[in-house]
């Protein structure tokens, strides 16, 4: 259900590398949420750094949405970068697992392609 990759990079360096890897793999970053910053703005003390990237590949999203608009509730894909146990972690929910919730077996290959690319993006960001 969850894919997690550790990296020796800081959250900031991993975020920069993720931006580049997303672009290199023909996905786009739609939004970046700074969870710590948002919590503080809402009056909640939150010491842990966490960035949540919303990423999308429009052609793949269209294939899925043309088949089942309910899948829009699971879009766009998200990749989080945070610290855990002294390491920086890149994490995402598996698109194949999410799409399985919508009973659309005909879209399994699309979900697998997206998942493979997201894992590739995460590996490039973690190591590159």
Predicted segments, located by residue:
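Terminal, regulation- and interaction-focused segments at domain boundaries
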Residues: 1-29, 123
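Short secondary-structure transition/capping segments
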Residues: 73-85, 122-128
């Amino acid at each position: 259900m969850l894919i997690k990759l550790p990296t020796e990079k800081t959250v900031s360096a991993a975020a920069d590398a993720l931006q580049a890897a997303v672009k290199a793999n023909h996905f786009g970053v739609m939004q970046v949420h700074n969870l710590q910053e948002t919590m503080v703005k809402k009056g909640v003390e939150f010491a842990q750094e966490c960035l949540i990237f919303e990423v999308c590949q429009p052609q793949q999203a269209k294939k899925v949405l043309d088949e089942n608009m309910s899948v829009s509730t699971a879009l766009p894909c998200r990749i989080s970068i945070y610290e855990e146990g002294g390491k920086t972690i890149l994490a995402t929910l598996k698109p194949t697992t999410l799409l399985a919730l919508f009973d659309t077996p005909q879209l399994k290959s699309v979900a697998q392609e997206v998942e493979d690319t997201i894992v590739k993006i995460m590996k490039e960001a973690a190591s590159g």
